[in-house]
Amino acid sequence: KEARPDALILSGDLTLDGEKVNHQEFAGRLRELEAAGVPVLVIPGNHDINNHNASAYFGDERTYVESVSPEEFKEIYGEFGYAEAASQAPDSLSYLYILNDTTWVMMLDTCIYNPENLVYGVIPEGTLVWMEQCLQSAYSQGITVIPVGHHNLQELSRVYVEECVIENHREAIKIFERYLTPVFLSGHLHVQRIMKHISEPGEDSDVYGIWEIVSNSLIIPPCQYGILNLHKDG
Protein backbone atom coordinates (compact mmCIF):
# COMPACT_ATOMS: atom_id res chain seq x y z
CA LYS A 1 0.00 0.00 0.00
CA GLU A 2 2.80 2.41 0.93
CA ALA A 3 4.57 2.01 -2.43
CA ARG A 4 1.42 3.03 -4.35
CA PRO A 5 2.26 1.28 -7.65
CA ASP A 6 0.25 2.03 -10.78
CA ALA A 7 -1.03 -1.55 -10.52
CA LEU A 8 -0.49 -4.83 -8.70
CA ILE A 9 -0.25 -7.57 -11.34
CA LEU A 10 -0.88 -11.19 -10.30
CA SER A 11 0.04 -13.77 -12.95
CA GLY A 12 -1.98 -16.67 -11.57
CA ASP A 13 -1.77 -19.41 -8.93
CA LEU A 14 -3.85 -17.33 -6.57
CA THR A 15 -4.72 -20.41 -4.49
CA LEU A 16 -3.09 -23.70 -3.53
CA ASP A 17 -5.45 -25.93 -5.51
CA GLY A 18 -8.34 -23.78 -6.68
CA GLU A 19 -10.43 -23.90 -3.51
CA LYS A 20 -13.48 -21.65 -3.93
CA VAL A 21 -13.32 -20.45 -0.34
CA ASN A 22 -9.68 -19.45 -0.81
CA HIS A 23 -10.51 -17.49 -3.94
CA GLN A 24 -13.25 -15.67 -2.05
CA GLU A 25 -11.01 -14.87 0.91
CA PHE A 26 -8.13 -13.74 -1.31
CA ALA A 27 -10.46 -11.45 -3.26
CA GLY A 28 -11.37 -9.86 0.07
CA ARG A 29 -7.69 -9.11 0.72
CA LEU A 30 -7.34 -7.59 -2.74
CA ARG A 31 -10.29 -5.29 -2.07
CA GLU A 32 -8.28 -3.75 0.75
CA LEU A 33 -5.57 -2.79 -1.75
CA GLU A 34 -8.06 -1.35 -4.22
CA ALA A 35 -9.67 0.63 -1.39
CA ALA A 36 -6.20 2.07 -0.71
CA GLY A 37 -5.96 3.22 -4.34
CA VAL A 38 -3.92 0.36 -5.83
CA PRO A 39 -5.52 -1.20 -8.95
CA VAL A 40 -5.24 -5.00 -9.00
CA LEU A 41 -5.08 -7.12 -12.18
CA VAL A 42 -5.42 -10.91 -12.06
CA ILE A 43 -5.41 -13.90 -14.38
CA PRO A 44 -5.74 -17.58 -13.43
CA GLY A 45 -2.87 -20.02 -12.99
CA ASN A 46 -3.01 -23.75 -13.58
CA HIS A 47 -3.87 -24.31 -9.89
CA ASP A 48 -6.91 -22.03 -9.89
CA ILE A 49 -9.81 -23.40 -11.98
CA ASN A 50 -11.60 -26.79 -12.12
CA ASN A 51 -8.97 -28.27 -9.82
CA HIS A 52 -9.99 -31.72 -8.55
CA ASN A 53 -7.34 -31.43 -5.81
CA ALA A 54 -9.16 -28.57 -4.07
CA SER A 55 -8.99 -29.47 -0.38
CA ALA A 56 -9.54 -28.37 3.21
CA TYR A 57 -7.24 -29.60 5.96
CA PHE A 58 -8.16 -30.28 9.58
CA GLY A 59 -5.05 -31.54 11.35
CA ASP A 60 -3.96 -34.61 9.41
CA GLU A 61 -7.36 -35.01 7.78
CA ARG A 62 -7.88 -33.92 4.18
CA THR A 63 -11.33 -33.23 2.78
CA TYR A 64 -12.03 -32.42 -0.86
CA VAL A 65 -13.91 -29.17 -1.35
CA GLU A 66 -15.46 -27.14 -4.14
CA SER A 67 -13.26 -25.52 -6.79
CA VAL A 68 -14.41 -22.85 -9.27
CA SER A 69 -15.42 -22.80 -12.92
CA PRO A 70 -14.03 -20.20 -15.37
CA GLU A 71 -17.27 -18.26 -14.99
CA GLU A 72 -17.02 -18.28 -11.19
CA PHE A 73 -13.38 -17.18 -11.33
CA LYS A 74 -14.36 -14.18 -13.46
CA GLU A 75 -17.24 -13.38 -11.11
CA ILE A 76 -15.12 -13.57 -7.95
CA TYR A 77 -12.32 -11.44 -9.43
CA GLY A 78 -14.51 -9.30 -11.67
CA GLU A 79 -13.44 -6.05 -10.03
CA PHE A 80 -9.74 -6.86 -10.46
CA GLY A 81 -9.28 -6.16 -14.14
CA TYR A 82 -12.26 -7.68 -15.88
CA ALA A 83 -14.78 -4.94 -15.10
CA GLU A 84 -12.34 -2.25 -16.27
CA ALA A 85 -11.10 -4.13 -19.35
CA ALA A 86 -10.93 -2.21 -22.61
CA SER A 87 -11.25 -5.50 -24.51
CA GLN A 88 -11.65 -9.20 -23.75
CA ALA A 89 -10.63 -12.27 -25.76
CA PRO A 90 -13.42 -14.39 -27.27
CA ASP A 91 -12.21 -17.80 -26.07
CA SER A 92 -10.32 -17.31 -22.80
CA LEU A 93 -10.17 -15.19 -19.65
CA SER A 94 -7.70 -12.81 -21.33
CA TYR A 95 -8.27 -9.06 -21.32
CA LEU A 96 -6.65 -5.71 -22.07
CA TYR A 97 -6.27 -3.07 -19.38
CA ILE A 98 -5.37 0.56 -20.08
CA LEU A 99 -2.80 1.49 -17.44
CA ASN A 100 -2.27 5.06 -18.67
CA ASP A 101 -2.01 7.11 -21.86
CA THR A 102 1.19 5.38 -22.97
CA THR A 103 0.94 1.85 -21.54
CA TRP A 104 -1.50 -1.04 -21.86
CA VAL A 105 -1.35 -4.29 -19.89
CA MET A 106 -2.42 -7.45 -21.74
CA MET A 107 -3.46 -10.14 -19.25
CA LEU A 108 -3.24 -13.48 -21.10
CA ASP A 109 -5.03 -16.58 -19.87
CA THR A 110 -2.69 -19.44 -20.88
CA CYS A 111 -4.34 -22.12 -18.75
CA ILE A 112 -6.20 -25.25 -19.81
CA TYR A 113 -9.15 -26.14 -17.57
CA ASN A 114 -11.85 -27.43 -19.93
CA PRO A 115 -12.95 -30.17 -19.74
CA GLU A 116 -10.37 -30.74 -16.96
CA ASN A 117 -7.50 -28.93 -15.28
CA LEU A 118 -4.08 -29.52 -16.88
CA VAL A 119 -0.61 -28.31 -15.85
CA TYR A 120 0.71 -27.15 -19.22
CA GLY A 121 -0.55 -24.09 -21.04
CA VAL A 122 -1.44 -22.70 -24.45
CA ILE A 123 -2.77 -19.48 -25.95
CA PRO A 124 -6.05 -20.39 -27.71
CA GLU A 125 -6.33 -19.58 -31.41
CA GLY A 126 -9.00 -16.93 -30.94
CA THR A 127 -6.92 -15.28 -28.24
CA LEU A 128 -3.87 -15.21 -30.55
CA VAL A 129 -5.90 -13.34 -33.17
CA TRP A 130 -7.28 -10.96 -30.54
CA MET A 131 -3.77 -10.50 -29.10
CA GLU A 132 -2.33 -9.43 -32.44
CA GLN A 133 -5.21 -7.03 -33.07
CA CYS A 134 -4.53 -5.35 -29.72
CA LEU A 135 -0.78 -5.16 -30.38
CA GLN A 136 -1.34 -3.76 -33.85
CA SER A 137 -3.68 -1.08 -32.51
CA ALA A 138 -1.22 -0.10 -29.79
CA TYR A 139 1.74 -0.05 -32.18
CA SER A 140 -0.06 2.30 -34.56
CA GLN A 141 -0.66 4.71 -31.65
CA GLY A 142 2.84 4.52 -30.18
CA ILE A 143 1.57 2.74 -27.06
CA THR A 144 3.67 0.21 -25.13
CA VAL A 145 1.99 -3.11 -24.34
CA ILE A 146 3.11 -5.27 -21.42
CA PRO A 147 1.76 -8.82 -21.86
CA VAL A 148 1.35 -11.03 -18.79
CA GLY A 149 0.77 -14.79 -18.79
CA HIS A 150 0.93 -17.55 -16.21
CA HIS A 151 3.01 -19.99 -18.26
CA ASN A 152 6.43 -19.14 -19.58
CA LEU A 153 7.38 -17.86 -23.01
CA GLN A 154 10.86 -19.43 -22.87
CA GLU A 155 12.67 -22.29 -21.15
CA LEU A 156 13.97 -20.53 -18.05
CA SER A 157 14.65 -23.45 -15.72
CA ARG A 158 16.98 -26.45 -15.89
CA VAL A 159 15.09 -28.07 -13.03
CA TYR A 160 11.51 -27.69 -14.28
CA VAL A 161 11.70 -28.57 -17.96
CA GLU A 162 8.24 -30.00 -18.64
CA GLU A 163 4.80 -28.37 -18.85
CA CYS A 164 6.18 -24.89 -18.19
CA VAL A 165 6.54 -23.25 -21.60
CA ILE A 166 3.43 -22.19 -23.53
CA GLU A 167 2.75 -24.87 -26.17
CA ASN A 168 2.57 -22.35 -29.02
CA HIS A 169 5.27 -20.07 -27.59
CA ARG A 170 7.14 -19.74 -30.89
CA GLU A 171 4.07 -18.33 -32.60
CA ALA A 172 3.45 -16.00 -29.65
CA ILE A 173 7.05 -14.74 -29.68
CA LYS A 174 6.83 -13.98 -33.41
CA ILE A 175 3.70 -11.92 -32.83
CA PHE A 176 5.16 -10.06 -29.85
CA GLU A 177 8.40 -9.26 -31.64
CA ARG A 178 6.56 -8.17 -34.79
CA TYR A 179 5.32 -5.22 -32.73
CA LEU A 180 8.56 -4.70 -30.75
CA THR A 181 7.00 -5.74 -27.44
CA PRO A 182 9.64 -4.99 -24.78
CA VAL A 183 8.89 -7.52 -22.06
CA PHE A 184 6.66 -10.47 -21.15
CA LEU A 185 5.77 -11.15 -17.50
CA SER A 186 5.04 -14.70 -16.35
CA GLY A 187 4.82 -16.98 -13.31
CA HIS A 188 4.32 -20.76 -12.99
CA LEU A 189 7.92 -21.56 -11.93
CA HIS A 190 7.46 -19.87 -8.52
CA VAL A 191 10.95 -18.35 -8.77
CA GLN A 192 12.44 -15.05 -9.89
CA ARG A 193 14.07 -15.20 -13.35
CA ILE A 194 14.87 -12.90 -16.28
CA MET A 195 15.91 -13.82 -19.82
CA LYS A 196 16.10 -12.19 -23.24
CA HIS A 197 14.84 -14.10 -26.27
CA ILE A 198 17.62 -14.82 -28.77
CA SER A 199 16.57 -15.86 -32.26
CA GLU A 200 19.72 -17.87 -32.97
CA PRO A 201 22.93 -18.88 -31.16
CA GLY A 202 25.67 -16.27 -31.24
CA GLU A 203 23.30 -13.41 -32.00
CA ASP A 204 24.68 -9.98 -31.08
CA SER A 205 23.46 -8.88 -27.65
CA ASP A 206 22.39 -5.52 -29.08
CA VAL A 207 19.87 -7.13 -31.44
CA TYR A 208 16.27 -6.65 -30.31
CA GLY A 209 14.54 -9.56 -28.60
CA ILE A 210 11.66 -9.65 -26.14
CA TRP A 211 12.67 -9.99 -22.49
CA GLU A 212 10.85 -12.29 -20.09
CA ILE A 213 10.59 -11.69 -16.36
CA VAL A 214 9.30 -14.52 -14.17
CA SER A 215 7.94 -13.65 -10.74
CA ASN A 216 7.12 -15.83 -7.77
CA SER A 217 3.57 -16.48 -6.55
CA LEU A 218 2.66 -13.80 -4.02
CA ILE A 219 0.61 -16.24 -1.91
CA ILE A 220 3.37 -18.84 -1.44
CA PRO A 221 6.15 -18.25 1.13
CA PRO A 222 8.45 -16.39 1.01
CA CYS A 223 5.76 -14.31 -0.81
CA GLN A 224 8.20 -12.63 -3.18
CA TYR A 225 7.24 -9.98 -5.68
CA GLY A 226 8.99 -7.75 -8.18
CA ILE A 227 8.80 -4.05 -8.95
CA LEU A 228 8.85 -3.03 -12.61
CA ASN A 229 9.75 0.55 -13.47
CA LEU A 230 9.11 1.59 -17.07
CA HIS A 231 11.23 4.34 -18.59
CA LYS A 232 11.15 5.62 -22.14
CA ASP A 233 14.50 5.23 -23.92
CA GLY A 234 16.34 8.51 -24.21
Give residue spans per PLM region.
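His/acidic metal-ligating clusters that form di-metal
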Residues: 4, 39, 98, 104-107, ...
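Binuclear metal-dependent phosphoesterase catalytic core
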Residues: 99, 204-234
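Acidic-and-aromatic substrate-binding clefts and catalytic sites of carbohydrate-active enzymes
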Residues: 16-21, 85-87, 162-163, 218-221
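Extended active-site neighborhood of metal-dependent phosphoesterases/phosphodiesterases
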Residues: 25-129, 206-207, 227
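N-terminal active-site segment of His-dependent metallophosphoesterases
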Residues: 1-20
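Divalent metal-coordination and catalytic microenvironments
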Residues: 8, 13, 26, 45, ...
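Short catalytic/ligand-binding loop motif for oxyanion handling, primarily in non-cytosolic enzymes
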Residues: 16-19, 49-53, 114-116, 154-157, ...
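Active-site metal-binding loops of divalent metal-dependent hydrolases
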Residues: 12-14, 46-48, 110-111, 150-152, ...
